Curated annotation (Swiss-Prot):
InterPro entries assigned to the protein according to its UniProt record, in alphabetical order: NADH_UbQ_OxRdtase_su1/FPO, NADH_UbQ_OxRdtase_su1_CS
Source species: Verminephrobacter eiseniae (strain EF01-2)
Protein name (Swiss-Prot/TrEMBL): NADH-quinone oxidoreductase subunit H
Name of one Pfam family that matches: NADHdh
TM helices/strands, residue ranges: 20-40, 95-115, 130-150, 176-196, 206-226, 261-281, 297-317, 336-356
HAMAP family per UniProt: NDH1_NuoH
Amino acid sequence: MIDALYQAGLQLLPGGWWTGMVWPVLWILLKIVALLIPLMGAVAYLTLWERKLLGFMQVRHGPNRVGPWGLLQPIADALKLLTKEIIQPTAASRGLFVLGPVMAIMPALAAWVVIPFGPDVALANVNAGLLLVMAITSIEVYGVIIAGWASNSKYAFLGALRASAQMVSYEIAMGFCLLIVIMVSGSMNLTEIVLAQGRGVAAANGIGFLSWNWLPLLPVFLVYLISGVAETNRHPFDVVEGEAEIVAGHMVEYSGMGFAIFFLAEYASMWLVSILAALMFLGGWLPPVDSASLHWIPGWIWLGIKTCLVVSMFIWIRATFPRFRYDQIMRLGWKIFIPVTLACLLIAGGWLLSPWNIWK
């Protein structure tokens, strides 16, 4: 579909040597805009959905003053943050202080380039797409470290140390989870990983959701979800910005849009972790059952529903569990999740070589 649009645009332009030079660059810019505008809208309205859902769970009203049912609240928040003064501490490293938020949000946005929204709907259909996502998202920790160091504050630096240790620790468990999915799917291409979940005995009998990876890889799925919460520094793993100890962690010296960019990166990472869970474990754009009454629903709607359910799980966890101590978080990552995922890796390898291989 993306290639067809590119060729159609090429034919509409007048001929000439410059067309072959200008259109590819213009096409790249159009794809970037087509990705960023909906993503920024989704990130903005995720903040509203979180506040509304938390209000429902805590038996109170969420934001309901700006616009009908509070639907314009994210726009009001954005305008408020845009008009706030950006203050830099006098002892801060000015260049690095500005670079920190940029380094935090760039990987969270760049990884979306290889995310497929349908069998032929992806900005870049890369064969090693899952590996590329892992590589890009691992850079995000540098933004946190730079922000903590450049602020020249003990609270910011301590928060950055906590964040970097936590993110690196849970990246290992998440990496093993993704490796298991790659093994059973036989590919690192995200489109092929989704299509591989449409095969099997259950899918052949029209019960597609039983052939998705969430069922045979249930322990791996649970580890991935919990590691995703920790990786994005969300509650109850948000000791990075523990208000009672270090105020706001590595963001303590930031104000205005500098502060907002860190939150945009956090919510963009939530969407990314959620859509990866939908693609790798929940069948992506595949419908749950093979029914004629469901064929009219586009695949991207199924993918959106599954992604929203996973995102809502993030919010439900925030409303339910108390914050963990830092030593408990490290113990969970190193002493429980990594051994469990290593054991699952060995079991999955033996399962693939056995006569009971269900992924043939």
